[in-house]
């Protein structure tokens, strides 16, 4: 399974693919062909769900 990185943003937290990186200033994920994903906290791990 692919792993995702969590990007913190002002309104929401999104996830990026492992290869992709987050913008430092805007703290947003790079453009993806698929829909954007957001991070959800579950116990001690972060998981991504389709937004």
From Swiss-Prot:
Task: Keywords in alphabetical order, please.
Answer: Chromosome, Developmental protein, Differentiation, Disulfide bond, DNA condensation, DNA-binding, Nucleosome core, Nucleus, Spermatogenesis
The record's family statement is: Belongs to the protamine P1 family.
Subcellular location per the Swiss-Prot or TrEMBL entry: Nucleus; Chromosome
Cystine pairings recorded for this chain: none
Q: Provide the primary localization.
A: nucleus
Q: Subunit notes for this chain? A: Cross-linked by interchain disulfide bonds around the DNA-helix.
Q: Tell me any Pfam family this protein matches.
A: Protamine_P1
- As recorded in Swiss-Prot or TrEMBL, the protein's gene is named PRM1
Q: Give the GO cellular component terms, alphabetically.
A: nucleosome; nucleus
In Swiss-Prot or TrEMBL terms, this protein is called: Sperm protamine P1
Its GO biological process annotations read: chromosome condensation; sperm DNA condensation
**InterPro entries the record matches:** Protamine_P1
For the keyword Nucleus, the answer is yes
Q: Has the keyword Glycoprotein been applied to this entry?
A: no
Q: What is the lineage of its organism?
A: Eukaryota, Metazoa, Chordata, Craniata, Vertebrata
């Amino acid at each position: 399974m692919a792993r995702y990185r969590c990007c913190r943003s002002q309104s929401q937290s999104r996830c990026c693919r492992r290869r992709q990186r987050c913008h430092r200033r805007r703290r947003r994920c790079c453009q993806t062909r698929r829909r954007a994903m957001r991070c959800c906290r579950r116990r001690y791990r972060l998981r991504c769900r389709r937004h």
